[in-house]
């Protein structure tokens, strides 16, 4: 039997630092093949190593979505690109740098087994840095798959970071550059700037920041509509053995796509949780505090990643249990869908494989993995005619008509991206 969520009192979360820098205003994804240097690049720009999970540290790969904020600055005395930095004091002239903006980085796992995690993270990205290592032939399977995922989800503000230039010859860097140009031809990244860097040695970080500033602008935000937040992580922040009277409520992590959520607001979480009868019920709770960029704030707005502390029983939020839910004011959220019809646009070839394979038409009774917002669900095809497909979902989603869907099919032992859908 679950404890009543309202019995969980609020005790402030420990905050590691307080800062006067602006709150993050844009979410930028780091995507690309496993071991090409995404996490190292986030650390070079933000000072935060996003692999904190014990298994991640042991295996040396990202498993969960990682998050870190970085404040981009500009030296008033340097010429571009040297003027761009994350340092408060210019290392060349010793003068104070001017703040441009703070960005939130979403570090996606590059391993093929973790594609669903990458798709979930892509739902909250405003733009992306595609990291491609110069010491391997381009494209690698997940380089292809991640770029196609960005295209399917509608992310077209892309910068390419050609990483690891410090461990290859100049000739190899130029050869790899041509491989990248050939690879992105005809894709959403065809005109993306390609910046040669070494994340490990922090080489050309200034040129990369300049490219991000010029290529990935902060989108216009809708602050007046009812709020809608996509949950990308959820936590129980209590240490084992915490006495019941000191337990903290569950924490939701994610990003708002519109509106504002304030401390003290009543919120609804859909689809919610499954009861003993197999029915899904929304959760209702109160916002106890909001953390953004390492500090408490009174309200959450679109742009950047936020943590919302609630009165929910922490067993409901532990281990990312509420990922894929959406949060808003009660009665103002999209419908919960147990099935939907979508207009489908299939790729010509399956991406993520070493060998080429054509995408066959979707068939009746076929299981598909569907990414809708931050939700990943399985759907069984109940009708398939031309480009209109109906699916019955194993786990419901909360989504508006017109929402994009990334569609994956089982190929061998893995789910592979095969196309995009629009909910009708």
From Swiss-Prot:
Residues 198-200 are annotated as: G5. HAMAP family: eIF_2_gamma (MF_00119). The gene is eif2g. Its cofactor is Mg(2+). Signal peptide: none annotated. GTP binds at residues 35-40, 163-166, 198-200. Disulfide bonds: none annotated. Its EC number is 3.6.5.3. The keyword Cell inner membrane does not apply. Residues 107-110 are annotated as: G3. InterPro entries: EFTu-like_2 (IPR004161), eIF2G (IPR050543), eIF2g_C (IPR015256), eIF2g_dom_2 (IPR044127), eIF2g_GTP-bd (IPR044128), P-loop_NTPase (IPR027417), Small_GTP-bd (IPR005225), T_Tr_GTP-bd_dom (IPR000795). Residues 32-39 are annotated as: G1. It is an enzyme of class 3 (hydrolase). It comes from Archaeoglobus fulgidus (strain ATCC 49558 / DSM 4304 / JCM 9628 / NBRC 100126 / VC-16). Coiled coil: none annotated. Keywords: GTP-binding, Hydrolase, Initiation factor, Magnesium, Metal-binding, Nucleotide-binding, Protein biosynthesis. Belongs to the TRAFAC class translation factor GTPase superfamily. Classic translation factor GTPase family. EIF2G subfamily. One of its GO terms (cellular component) is cytosol. One of its GO terms (molecular function) is GTP binding. Mg(2+) 2 binds at residues 35, 60. This is Translation initiation factor 2 subunit gamma. It catalyses: GTP + H2O = GDP + phosphate + H(+).
């Amino acid at each position: 039997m679950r404890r009543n969520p309202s019995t969980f009192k609020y005790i402030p979360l420990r905050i590691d630092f307080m800062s006067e820098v602006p709150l993050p205003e844009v979410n930028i994804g780091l995507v690309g093949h496993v071991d090409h240097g995404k996490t190292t690049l986030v650390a070079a720009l933000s000072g935060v190593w996003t692999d904190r999970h014990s298994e991640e540290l042991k295996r040396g790969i990202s498993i969960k979505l990682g998050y870190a904020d970085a404040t981009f600055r500009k030296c008033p005395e340097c010429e571009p690109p040297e003027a761009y930095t994350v340092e408060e004091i210019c290392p060349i002239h010793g003068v104070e740098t001017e703040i441009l903006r703070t960005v939130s980085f979403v570090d996606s796992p590059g391993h093929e087994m973790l594609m669903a995690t990458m798709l979930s993270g892509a739902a909250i990205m405003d733009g992306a840095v595609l990291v491609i290592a110069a010491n391997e032939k381009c494209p690698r399977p997940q380089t292809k798959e991640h770029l196609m995922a960005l295209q399917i989800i509608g992310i077209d503000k892309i910068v390419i970071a050609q990483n690891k230039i410090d461990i290859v010859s100049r000739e190899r860097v130029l050869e790899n550059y041509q491989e990248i140009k050939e690879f992105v031809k005809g894709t959403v990244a065809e005109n993306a700037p390609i910046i040669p860097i070494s994340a490990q040695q922090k080489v050309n970080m200034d040129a990369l920041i300049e490219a991000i500033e010029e290529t990935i602008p902060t989108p216009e935000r809708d602050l007046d509509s009812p709020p809608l937040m996509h949950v990308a992580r959820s936590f129980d922040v209590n240490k084992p053995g915490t006495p019941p009277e000191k337990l903290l409520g569950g924490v939701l992590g994610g990003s708002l796509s519109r509106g504002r959520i304030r401390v003290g607001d009543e919120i609804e979480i859909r689809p919610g949780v499954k009861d003993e009868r197999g029915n899904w019920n929304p959760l209702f709770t109160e916002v106890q505090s909001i953390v953004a960029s390492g500090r408490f704030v009174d309200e959450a707005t679109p742009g950047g990643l936020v943590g919302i502390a609630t009165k929910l029983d922490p067993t409901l939020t532990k281990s990312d249990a509420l990922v894929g839910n959406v949060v808003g004011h009660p009665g103002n959220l999209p419908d919960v869908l147990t099935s939907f019809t979508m207009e489908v646009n299939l790729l010509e070839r399956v991406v993520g494989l070493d060998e080429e394979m054509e995408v066959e038409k979707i068939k009746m009774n076929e299981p598909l993995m569907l990414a809708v917002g931050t939700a990943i669900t399985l759907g069984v095809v109940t009708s398939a005619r031309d480009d209109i497909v109906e699916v019955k979902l194993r786990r419901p989603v909360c989504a508006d008509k017109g929402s994009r869907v990334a569609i994956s099919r089982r190929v061998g032992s893995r789910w592979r991206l095969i196309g995009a859908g629009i909910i009708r």
